[in-house]
Amino acid sequence: MWFKNCMVYRVNREVNFNADQLEKQLAEFRFTPCGSQDKQKFGWVSALGKHGDMMTHVSENRILVCAKREEKMLPASVIKDSLNAKVEEMEAEEGRPLKKKEKDALKEDIVIDLLPRAFSKSQLTFVLIMPTEGLILVDAGSYKKAEDVLSLLRKTMGSLPVVPAIPEIAVETTLTQWVKDGNLPQGFSLMEEAELKSLLDDGATIRCKKQELSSDEILSHIQANKVVTKLAINWQDRIRFVLAEDCSIKRLAYSDELKEQNDDIPHEDRAARLDADFSLLCGEMSVFLPDLFNALGGLPHPEA
């Protein structure tokens, strides 16, 4: 239930997020497993998995949904080897080289033959809708994966006017200044990990871990026209994370003090524990994210 990554999007026009209506809409795009000839399937599953029946899970107007993608694993090398063997066999039989059109048709036949026997992998992606804050959070490792899920949500709802929540001031400019002068806004502190890149197209990239970021070595890189593109940060000793230049938030780690607030709920009661953890996550994000964006100089004004 605790997000490991966070791609933050801002709702830039008024949207009525009605949980009951969304429940019905999600059901229309419910996930179904791959059939024998399907390369992939993408749809919605219960937000609490086997511990809940509803597609959505709601806490104080915040809505959690979950998308599932199943993909058949057909390595290109396997297809290529099978195709080469078949082409050699047919060219030997017919005594002539096969045309491109014939090879393409063979390739399609090979894929059709391999699909039913292919292994599949599945991935869950959670989306947290925060109407009061006007934010949507996607627990994904990249904006590309987040956009895929939001495209499905947009198709499901009919409309979803969102944009990545990117501050007006370039994130790398702010991160570089924080490392340079060591003066972070209240509640934020540097950890010991950063990535610095040269402003030159073919310049060097420096990655450091367990490194005192106020050291002369790090400052010399900044003076040599490198900017901080990733930075490990601590927020109020409650959340640790890595912030990147594209404003993606990764490797979220929550303090024991925070997570232990629900220790009175038995682990055996998974549904109750998930619900309580979700409430904690929502409460924390509703304070952390506005604090972070204010520290980064604020977001542009939304469209009228």
Swiss-Prot record:
It is found in: Cytoplasm, Nucleoid. One of its GO terms (molecular function) is double-stranded DNA binding. The keyword Cytoplasm applies. GO terms for biological process: DNA recombination; regulation of DNA recombination. The keyword Cytoplasm applies. It holds the Pfam family RdgC. Keywords: Cytoplasm, DNA recombination. It comes from the Bacteria. Its main location: cytoplasm. One of its GO terms (cellular component) is bacterial nucleoid. Belongs to the RdgC family. May be involved in recombination. HAMAP family: RdgC (MF_00194). NCBIfam families: PRK00321.1-3, PRK00321.1-5. PANTHER family: RECOMBINATION-ASSOCIATED PROTEIN RDGC. This is Recombination-associated protein RdgC. The lineage of its organism: Bacteria, Pseudomonadati, Pseudomonadota, Gammaproteobacteria, Vibrionales. The gene is rdgC.
